[in-house]
């Protein structure tokens, strides 16, 4: 099923990647032979974007042809919502530097803005949507064309309904889900099934943003 979304692989091909540190990624890269990861997953925190920029300028040289997948956190160190501060322009300088770095990277970048937004009490839905649009409008005005946005939820029992957090088809390129338990992969697990149905309704491809057996490294089997 193709939706002709930004950076969507053709002919039902699947791109796989790994993270969450350069060391872990390098170990995984060296451990697999025929199917090297095409994507490197990393995190950026809005209050500490400068640190991410400095790190990424070094790490991107290690794998120059890699696709980036970035989880952009809009929370402070205590887990408090920073969407109002973003909307007030407090982090404009940091975000400008962030997008400038991405633009210079040139390779495709998948940006999971406010990933796992549906955790109960994490974000105010209206402010989340406004902040999402603010961030997207900012990088588009800067002429950054190598970003695809990923609306990434963790739709489990007990999380918030996702629909009130949707910024609109114009602002979302991909849907994304984070999965960590085997039961979440069951066809009988309604929250994820409904999320996937929503993706089809909006004609968006789906990315698995994060997934691994809890507390078990890939190299250990």
Regions picked out by a protein language model, each given a short descriptive name:
Residues 48-151:
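Substrate-binding cleft of extracellular glycoside hydrolase catalytic domains
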Residues 1-37, 41-62, 141-221:
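Surface-exposed substrate-engagement region within the catalytic domains
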